[in-house]
Amino acid sequence: VIGGRAYSAISATDALLASAGASAHVNFAQTYSIPANTLNANSVLRISGSVLADQVDGTDTLEIKVYLGGTTLLTITAFDPSAVTDFATFNFEVVARAAAGATAACVGSGGWVTSDTGTEIRGAAVMATTNFATNGALVVKVSAKWSSTTALTNARLHTLNVDIV
């Protein structure tokens, strides 16, 4: 696992319907579980991916979050995908500052871009020193929340990549 790409998924089917993901975040099916004791001092975890609007209808907004374990790494500000070519991309880098353990200190930063009919909005996130239980498995996951339950609206976790170096 250490030394490069640990996980890569490209999915044509990992969709989240607005009718199922309104008012609360719902996890996409694609996840990656980092094995216990993988993140040690000076290990770098890189997470990247994209969410694509598969079907759009009306003015429903979409908010996306990326997690490591139970910690939110970044939140993509809600945007209104108005065409099936609209998307969001994200990347986040976590650096372990301590040996694997129950409270291994990590720091991180990353960014995101949304594209809504060609209009791009960018954002950034910084994670202050945060302790993770790296002596156990840590799950990388992505969730989304729609603003309403419009039946013909959905988004798909198009790609999810995890690198550990």
Feature names for model-found ranges:
Residues 2-165:
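Surface-exposed molecular-recognition determinants
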